[in-house]
Amino acid sequence: MNIFAEIWSRVLRLFDRQEMDKTAQSRSRRHKEEYEQTERINFTAIFAEYLANRTISDSTMSVKDGSGNDSRRSIWIADGLKKIWIRNKTTVSQALGIGGKVLVPYVQDGRPYVDIIDQSRMVITAMRGDEITGATLMADMGSKDGKVYYRFADYRLEGNVHTIRNRATTDNGGEIELGILPEWENIPPEIVINGPEHILFGYLKCPKDSREDKQIMGVPITFGADDVIRDLHTCLADIRREFSLKKSFVGADDRLFDKNERLPEGGLFKRFRTTGLKGGDFWEVFDPAIRESSYLARFQQLCALLESTVGVSPGILTEPRTASATATEIKSANAATFSMVDSIRENIETAFNQTAYALDVLAEVYGATPAGAMGDWQIVWDWDTSMMESSTETFNQFSELESRGLILPERLVAWATGMSLQEAKEEVAAAKALQPSTVDVLLTEE
C-alpha cells in the first residue's frame, strides 16, 4: 500500500509534527516495493529468508518475573509476546527485506495484543540520541460505502509524559470523525500516561549499516548492492538468451518438402539421384556449443560478490566452503554469517524488550493485572548455537562442569532436553527419588 508524500504532509500537520528525515518515508516505500516484487528472482528476499531461518530456528523465548518464576504480570506479558513470536520468522524476514517492522502493543478486553506494521507506515518525528521519542504511525485502515479511511496514531514522549493521539482521515489525508468505522468507535482520541521512560512500541530494525551518521530508519539487508544485483539479473538474462539462441535445428533440402511446404510425415523418404545443394547433404544439422561455463563462472563470481557486499559467509548463493573441513574450519568459514545472525538477534531482543516494556506500562494503566508489579519481568532467551558450536562438545563441557559440582544438574538437563529450568529441576528430583540409596544398595548386597 502506498501513501503519497502529500498525504503524509497533511497528516503530520494534523498532529503538528515534522518528519526528521525528509526522504526516509519515500525510501522505505521504495524498499518495500522492491522486496515485494515477485516477477523475477528476488535476491533480497533470498538473503532475508535465509538469515531469518538461521536466526530463529530451534530458538525459544519466555518471560519470567525477576526471580525466574511465573507471575501474573510475566504471564500476561508473555501472552502478548508469544502472539508475535510464533510468526517471528516471517516478521524477521520482512524486517530484513524492507529495513524494519514496528511492533505496536495494545489492550483489548483485558488481553494483550501486538500489531506488526511495516516501517514504511511510520514517520519518526523526534529522537533522543538513538532512541525514538516521537513517531506517527498509520495504525489501521478500513473501508465503508466504497471509501477508504485511515487511522493514524501519534506517539510522543516528553519528559516522563507519554501521549498517544488517534485521528481518522480520508484517502487524501483530510480529517474525519474517529467513529467513522464501527471498530474505531471506542478508541479514545487522546491517551496521556505519566511515568514512562520509553516510547510505547517496539522497533525491529535490520542491522545493515545505512552508511549515514544518524541512522534513523533501517535499510534492507542488500542495501548498497544495487549494481551487483542488476548485473546478476543481466547475467541471468544472458544465460537464458544463450540457451535460447543455441537451440539445435535441422535444415532440409527444399526437394524434401511437398507442395504445401511440409516434410513427409513418415520415416521413409523418396530417394534422389542427386545430392543436396551444391553437392552437399540433404540434411544439415545446426548444433553449436553453448558457452555455459563462461556465463556460469561470471554468475558465480557475482554471487560471491553479493555475499561479500551483504556481509555474510559463502554458502547462501555459492557453494559453502565446508567440504572435508574440520569443526574449527567450519566455524571459521561461517564466522561472517554468524556475526550477522548475532546482530539480528540483538535487534530482536531490543525490539521485544521495548514491546514488553510497553505491555508492562499498559497492564498497569488498564489494570490488566494487579498493580504494583511494574518492571518485575525479564525475557529469557535460548538461542540455537549449532551453527557455530558442536552439540557433542557442548554436552561434554556441561557434563564436566556438573561432575565437578560447578553447575547444578538441572542446568545440564535443561540444555539437553529443552526444558525450562524449573521443569528440569523437577525432573532431576524425580530421577533421584527413583535411585536406591547407598544403604539400600549395601543391604541388598549383604
Write out the residue ranges for each language-model feature:
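Extended, regular secondary-structure scaffolds
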Residues: 102-216
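Short amphipathic alpha-helical segments
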Residues: 73, 80, 84-88, 95, ...
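Ser/Thr- (and often Asn-) enriched beta-sheet segments in non-cytosolic proteins
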Residues: 62, 163, 177, 249-250, ...
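Extended, charged amphipathic alpha-helical segments
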Residues: 182-332, 336, 368-375
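Extended, helix-rich architectural segments
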Residues: 1-122, 127, 132, 320, ...
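Short coil/turn segments at secondary-structure boundaries
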Residues: 91, 243-251, 316-321, 410-417, ...
